[in-house]
Regions:
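Bacterial N-terminal signal peptides that target proteins for export
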Residues: 1-10
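General helical structural elements
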Residues: 10-11, 168
């Protein structure tokens, strides 16, 4: 090997080694911290929340559906937060939206104004798994003031892994989360939303209730859907997600994660 070729080979190898950490950092799954709830009151205000670790959804690269209809951060963006205690998950969002709280009953539930929570209740689950498992859930929170329908989609969970926990509420018009509470406060740019969801909502007689603990890391993700309301405008409905692409609906490896802390 001549000296020039040898130097080129060594230089290329060095460049690859140096770029590897940057590539790993670029592709690392996003993570937030959920602190233990301390005096959280479900009133739509975020005064009692630790807001140090948000899941931010505001970039054009985070539009996963009908991107040509997304008109920027003021059209649709959100900052999500999570907290916990021994029996509940607490969720909050500061939503920027130009046509907030829009719902049309004839549309599929994924075409309504909604917030979607993707959550695993198994801290031992492989974050690189590409198939939903027994403890993976997709929860819909409909942003329709006065109704607040909810649903859980389990259609993507293989039948032998569902443990008889099937989809509920996907036709709309129901609140399927027993003990769920939510509230909003309207703002000049949209609204703030907060909610509490009992962990028992993700269990049945075959799936144990998850008992959270400091240090647990769970796969999770957030998405938000915006229908321009009223009609017309129902053919294309932009949707944004904290992490991943439309594959998040079938592939948990594209989710982010949340670590539980005091």
């Amino acid at each position: 090997m001549n000296k020039w070729l040898k130097r080129l080979t060594i230089g290329t190898a060095a460049a690859l080694v140096l770029s590897a950490p940057a590539l790993a950092e670029e592709t690392a799954r996003p993570n937030i911290t959920a602190h233990k709830a301390n005096g959280i009151v479900i009133d739509g205000k975020l005064d009692e929340w630790n807001l140090d670790s948000p899941a931010v959804v505001k970039d054009a690269t985070q539009v996963i559906r009908d991107a040509m209809l997304w008109k920027g951060e003021d059209d649709l963006s959100a900052t999500f937060y999570m907290a916990w205690d021994e029996e509940n998950l607490y969720l909050a969002a500061d939503v920027h939206e130009d046509t907030p709280l829009g719902a049309i009953e004839m549309l599929p539930i994924d075409g309504e104004d909604n917030i979607k929570l993707y959550i695993s209740t198994d801290p031992s689950a492989d974050p690189a798994r590409t198939e939903y498992g027994t403890n993976d859930f997709l929860v819909y929170f409909i942003m329709d003031e006065g109704y607040w329908d909810t649903a859980i989609d389990r259609s993507m969970v293989p039948k032998d892994a569902r443990q008889r926990f099937v989809s509920v509420g996907m036709d709309g018009g129901e609140s399927v989360l027993e003990g769920y509470e939510c509230a909003i406060q309207k703002t000049t740019t949209g609204f703030t939303w907060e909610a509490v969801v009992p962990l028992a909502c993700f269990s049945n007689n075959k799936i144990e209730v998850y008992t959270p603990a400091v240090g647990d890391t769970l796969s999770c993700n957030f998405a938000i859907t915006d229908i321009d309301y009223p009609c017309p405008g129902t053919e294309y409905i932009p949707q944004m997600a904290w992490s991943g692409t439309l594959k998040i609906n079938t592939d948990p490896s594209e989710w982010g994660s949340v670590t539980l802390a005091e």
